[in-house]
Amino acid sequence: MTRFKFMLLSAACLLFAQACTQSTFEKYFEDKSLRIDYMSMGDAQSQTAVVHELREEPVWGGPKKNLIEPFGYGEYLLEVYDHESSELIYSRSFCSLFGEWRTTAEAKTETQAWYNSISIPYPKNTILVDLKSRNKADMQFYSIMQHVIDPSSMFIDKAPLAENKVVAIQDNGDPAEKVDLVFIAEGYTQDELDKFFADAERFTEALFNCPPFDTCRDQWNVWAVGTVSIDSGTSSSGVGIYKNTALKTGYYTFGLDRYLTTKDMKSIKDATWNVPCDAVFLLINAETYGGGGIYNSYACGTADNERTLNVFTHEFGHSFAGLGDEYFESTVAYESYYNLEKELWEPNITTLVDFDSKWKDLLPEGTPIPTPLNDETKDGIGVFEGGGYLSEGIYRPMDHCMMRDYAPFCPACSRAILKMVDFLSDKQ
């Protein structure tokens, strides 16, 4: 009887905690979105940001219980405070292409301003938005923009935007309790939209045939947004090809031919204004190898290269779960991307400064740290030198992984992915 009473008490406490968490959303937010468009400005040494535009949008697809992010990932952190009580009521971390640009040689001599956008649940009362940037010297976040927002302001745009054709490839239920993945068409003309929707279905099946995504398919919704481009394909400025496309993607980001991205965050957000959205993949109607993935921003890749599906999964690992690159043999545009004196925020690479916070608990007993790469260790989990674009000073969990060379995700990456799935589907 005592055990039965304890079980009842535990269940009651759990239900009470869930009710309190749910009421936090109901207390502070409405079931729609506030989109905050802002300009990031700066160079390699410093940066700031200013709000450009605010929009009310009809759908909030994110979790309603998990409002405060626990991961500590990313180069930026958005914190939302109730203005009256100063209580932290929402937070999300992310990265941006502007943040990457700041690590290039160009940023040492130029100052630029880039457009960016992030959405939060729509507040019921006045809020303070605090945008912070990570300082690589100490890996802490420092404020670069604070802005007070009155949700009743007449200056918040409420106009509907263009409605594209949206197909539910997989609808498993309430967006607040599912991860909502959105494929957006890029470089598909009106006559090519049928191909886009077929491509999106093909990519969906590829994702859920890949461990660990194959174990959690029921926690996902998948949507395809048929944005129409005037031109077919994508730009490739390095060889003189320029296309008029919906999202303005192109190869040669930072001068690197395979790095395929876009600066046009406004068009991405415009395309998803009426669709629940936790993760975005820009599906580009092209054959040439290329892609990119930016944590909690977007990933993109081409539809028809022979390595397309592997590129998709790799880049999605970046954008969805904050996974770092584990390769160290290829050319990149970044300079001094990581501070080797501090621990890295990505869950699958380490400097060993704070390895206890990484995948140490996944290692078999007696595994040497670092782990020598030999015939006995090459197929198992360990701490192998080389990763994060450097052959020395950064370590990866396995010799081969999706984040290095398109092998299956290693245990450290898989755990990080599943934690993010549970967080975004309100299961944590």
Where are the predicted features?
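Fold-level signature of zinc-dependent metallopeptidase catalytic domains
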Residues: 154-214, 224-234
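Active-site-proximal segments of metallohydrolase catalytic domains
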Residues: 219-295
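Solvent-exposed loop/turn segments at secondary-structure junctions
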Residues: 187-190, 228-231, 286-290, 306-308, ...
